[in-house]
Amino acid sequence: MNVTSPKDGNHSFSKKNRFNTNKPRFHKLNEQAQSINLPEDRDSIVSSNTTSIMTDDAFDYNEGIASRTKNINSDSDRSNDTIKQNNYNKRETGYNPFYNGSGINQRYTQFRKREFEPTLAENKAEEYISDEDNVKIDEDNIENELQFTPKIKEASILRSSLLGQRNVLNTRNPKSKESHIKVKPIINNKSSSQRKSSAALRKQLGKPLPLPYLNSPNSDSTPTLQRKEEVFTDEVLQKKRELIESKWHRLLFHDKKMVEKKLESLREYERKRMPPRGTDVSSSEQDNSFKISTPTKSYVSLEQKPLPNLSAMNNFNDVTDNKEKEETNNNILKFQAQRDPLQILQSEIEMHTKKLDTIIELLKDDTDSKEKRKVVTNDNAAPEQMVNKGWRKNVMMIYKKSGNIMKKYREYFLWTICILILLYCNIYVYYRF
């Protein structure tokens, strides 16, 4: 490498004399050469393969650089001014392809052609593609095609659309209506969330009111007044009282007949089983069982307002007699003129409470008589009869216990049956429709 000073441009150093010079002068010359701001030579820039593309022009350019370096080494005695002039001349002539615009465009077009028009070697490589590569290519094509495919609709929407198409076809072809099966429209298109919300609303609102409460207030006022007027009339009271008394007598006679039948059956059974000594005692007690005792207590407090002219209700026989019944009715009618309609109703309620007291006491007397009979039979019965009677008692006790259990759990049993029926109906409706 030749180093020249700016003062003496024509003077040049040889290789032998360069090393013999003084060191300080050599350093000064190097510092002066480095201080000079020379323009960078773009031809000396080396680029990586990633950014540059080798072409024929670049090959020629490399050959020119090699020849130029040889000439520089051979002509070591030349000055730097001549070298710089040559470099500037080369740049002006357009020798460097990186500074020539037409060369860049040519390289760009060639590069694009190589991308879109593969060579023979690439075509041969494509011909020998393996099966796995073909499968991957097919999968990529399927994924690209699936982007444009329509989404699957819900079952309910598809059914409604199909039914609409069938209806349109049936309207166009009326002859084919008879041949095709009639399809029922889908009613329950609600989702589970909508059903739950409707059920929650029904629970909050409760059961629906009957129709009379939904009418207008003007329409409700007239019937209520009419009902009140009907309640406070004497004719209506008489009719209702007659109906109640007729029902009362029917119940009494029916119960009396049933009780008599049961007692007769018990008598016959005991006569067969009992010895002759105990027949008189048992018959006397059984006859006394039919006697009716007077009511001692009532379940409604009647001490504040005692009813007049109700002495005929003291005995059960007086209630059954028609003559005394007519007398009581007449007395009640006479007393109604002196009292308000509310007091009349209260008096009737008290009469019915007394009647209920009589029935309860009759039933108690029957139970007492049965217990006395059992005591007598136990005293006079033989050991074999005692065994039979003990077995009978056990059976009766089991029967009574079972009856009590059924009475207790009857309501629960009925509720379970109702719930099972409702579940069956819901399942049937859900799968049928």
Swiss-Prot record:
GO CC annotations on file: endoplasmic reticulum; half bridge of spindle pole body; microtubule
GO terms under biological process: cell division; karyogamy involved in conjugation with cellular fusion; spindle pole body duplication
Compartment list: Cytoplasm, Cytoskeleton, Microtubule organizing center, Spindle pole body
Presence of the UniProt keyword Signal in the record: no
Phosphothreonine: residues carrying this PTM: 233
Top-level lineage group: Eukaryota
Stretches the record annotates as Disordered: 1-38, 69-101, 207-227
Keyword rRNA-binding listed: no
The entry's keywords: Cell cycle, Cell division, Cytoplasm, Cytoskeleton, Microtubule, Mitosis, Phosphoprotein
Protein's job: KAR1 is required for function of both intranuclear and extranuclear microtubules. KAR1 helps localize CDC31 to the spindle pole body (SPB), CDC31 then initiates SPB duplication via interaction with a downstream effector.
Subunit structure: Interacts with SPC72.
Annotated protein name in UniProt: Cell division control protein KAR1
Native species: Saccharomyces cerevisiae (strain ATCC 204508 / S288c) (Baker's yeast)
